[in-house]
Amino acid sequence: MDCIFCKIVNGEIPSKKLYEDDNVRVIMDVYPKVDGHSLIIPKKHITDFTEISDEELANVNKVAKLVGLSIMKKLGANALTKAVNYGDSQAVKHFHMHLLPDYTIKEKSDRSIDEIYEIIK
């Protein structure tokens, strides 16, 4: 299968891993919308949210809470948005959840992904 997210969770493509368990890997988004923008990616290839089981989705949400709260604390965010794209808005056809920290200042800083990663890993 030629899925970039499958290659990332299998270690074929390097990523900035924030968290991993038997079912998911959380990585920094390489094209972040805000500082700390991260992705929760199931290790099993699931095309979109219509295919994910209730159990798998519950685990994704559990991880979203764990990692999201950590990111918020470490980066000083005052809120967090969880987002799942579907259909034409889903760029990669492998289910994933975006974690987008929300700050009082809405603009992305000039800090690099590497700098942000070092703060929240």
Positions of predicted regions on the chain:
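HIT superfamily nucleotide-processing domains
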Residues: 1-121
